[in-house]
């Protein structure tokens, strides 16, 4: 009996119902709530779990390399990146017989395979890998790192190797090590790889461990570095006629500032990328010496925060008390980390397509679409998580005495103003944007398209012009040949940049019009409403006028009984739960917009987007319906095709999504009655009644059922769109 799950909570382990199992799973990672937890054990558990996380990541990436080397066509793809379809892995057991085998035998493979839409082929090719042996070597190395991570995780749980709490709370040392060690040294190492391996490979020179010390990355070696003639490293760059992967048209420069794209690969110049990473390395190596540790140089973060007195006393005691508040709250730190990571992930989505870094990836349209969508969804989940942990911080870790009249306390003091401002912005955006869309929709329906309200995004066009786009005729900053910025940049990066920004075949600063204006504001509505729900959830987490003692009920509670009317749905968890729906909705609009605009760009019929995106029926008919037709036709009387698997996933995604509503709309009593009826029938059915249960079956709690519903809704939603996106893009462009 003593070993019943969950071992971390004796109270739960003794629960006689199935609640024991579900609550056990729900709180397994909430180390703070476990029975014998101390602050020291909490930090050590989290630290050790990080090594486990690293081991999983290394194992996964090792698996990617291994399967491509074993079952892929990397070497064939390298010979002709634009026409050979990259293979992710084989399909062991294609269902539906011979037609399936034929439909999925592609990319020059001998049997059925999956095509890779992740961009790994382009990435490995760009960084200098050329053979299957290279891939196997990488897979083995990552497997080795995975094993090392597991050993390190285990080691740091042994008494002799457990770090102390003071080690975890040494913020200055940790920041210095992460800035210099993690970002600085790794960026420098990456620059080294690019200069020593990737750039030579792009010029047809194969550098490996056997000749690594014999091949000079630059004809002048380290001479220019030590004599201060750094500009020599930028001389003689690759020419515009350079044939990637060969010496034809190649130069000798290793660190350049050419700007724009390599004409053949449509990706950033590798020598520009190396230069960028060297600059990043320099910045972070300097930044990693900024904070004072036992060497006595640099700043103390606490002193910095305490010394900052806001002008005019308008922010009270400013940042006083923040150092200890943040340093003693894991949730605050996690919230900050997630917020940063969420922003970065979304920026990755935006930059991977507009400024592609990997050779030939810009011409692989399905991969471009998949990577953009993938990173935006990931960003959405990470950002909502940031606010969730911010709310938990306010409930579990916030100390009003420690933070009296500082910026945190003042945020809480004027939360009504913050929430109501977000509210009116959301209402304004929502009603005006919907009003314009509906008006335009009605005009089209009545056959008078000329009566649409179409607004040119002149401010955004002005910003694009300032960056050098000439098609709007604004003649300002970089689009004006007389401006000082234009004259200053003319000798270095500007020609390449201007060439790229005014080229019609890439995704850099696409031309925008009234359709873009409308969908931009629809997305702004989604972002502001999601933010409103998340911010309100965090700021009201400790209490509100309606429920001043809210913090005593914890992060997720359904209600405080029937005696206090109106305490349902107002826990901080409920805000997170609601916000995730809005987040998914918003990213839906973002990805619809991105995908439709790009499909028309790639097909050369941008007028379809421009004309149809100004009214709702245009989006429904000319984007969603038109592009899902192949999916709806995945199985037909003529057998299968290579899109059939996506057609099935499209259906299955809808099924999972719809299942979510079963949990979201019906609550506990319904399920409890159903369970009791099923249990009654089970106990009276021959054979079935031989199987008994130790735990009395009970329905999920309200909060848990919502989580199950939300999980189905999210997973189904994303599966459905993933199938739609990949099938509609690959069906058109291969």
Swiss-Prot record:
Enzyme class: oxidoreductase
Principal location: plastid
Transmembrane annotation, as ranges: 46-69, 135-158, 175-199, 273-291, 330-353, 369-395, 417-439, 517-535, 575-596, 643-665, 707-727
Cellular component terms (Gene Ontology): chloroplast thylakoid membrane; photosystem I
Matches recorded under Gene3D superfamilies: Photosystem I PsaA/PsaB
Annotated binding of [4Fe-4S] cluster, by residue: 559, 568
Residues the record lists as binding phylloquinone: 671
Pfam families: PsaA_PsaB
EC number from the UniProt entry: 1.97.1.12
Function: PsaA and PsaB bind P700, the primary electron donor of photosystem I (PSI), as well as the electron acceptors A0, A1 and FX. PSI is a plastocyanin-ferredoxin oxidoreductase, converting photonic excitation into a charge separation, which transfers an electron from the donor P700 chlorophyll pair to the spectroscopically characterized acceptors A0, A1, FX, FA and FB in turn. Oxidized P700 is reduced on the lumenal side of the thylakoid membrane by plastocyanin.
HAMAP family (UniProt xref): PSI_PsaB (MF_00482)
Name of this chain's protein: Photosystem I P700 chlorophyll a apoprotein A2
Native organism taxonomy: Eukaryota, Viridiplantae, Streptophyta, Embryophyta, Tracheophyta
